[in-house]
Amino acid sequence: MMKSFYAAATWLTLGLAAGVFYREFTKLTGNLGVESELSLMHTHILALGMMMFLIVLALDAVLTLHTRRSFTVFFWVYNAGLAVTIVMMLIRGLLTLDGKSPADTSAAIPGIAGLGHILLTVGLIALFMAIREGLGEHQERLAARQSRLQSTREATVSEG
């Protein structure tokens, strides 16, 4: 569970740093208020990084997701995909502020960003697999607890 906490904290730090970088870089270069991918990085990192891992942390506390192989796949693949996607946003944003349109730049940028999105998707599929497994075990535990409570009630009634 601590991996999810540290991932959330790391993405929080990166998200806040991205916001400061955008503000200071655009002021420094005279591009304040210019729309670019840099202006979106802050919220993307906070939502897809920090908030995602805080939600995963809560799910892990209930469903013990961290014990599953599919969760490990999710953790590393999702983080890698988010990192690739964010780096490509950074590159595209810097190029945009430099006056280059997407048509003027390499086709590799959207291609690599697409690979980042594919990694994010694979990670999310692995997360859903871990959640499904966790829900199945959680339902079994609830049914067993309900059965024990019922047995205790019946024993109490028959004694009384």
Could you say what each language-model-derived stretch is?
Residues M1-G160:
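Hydrophobic alpha-helical transmembrane segments of multi-pass integral membrane proteins
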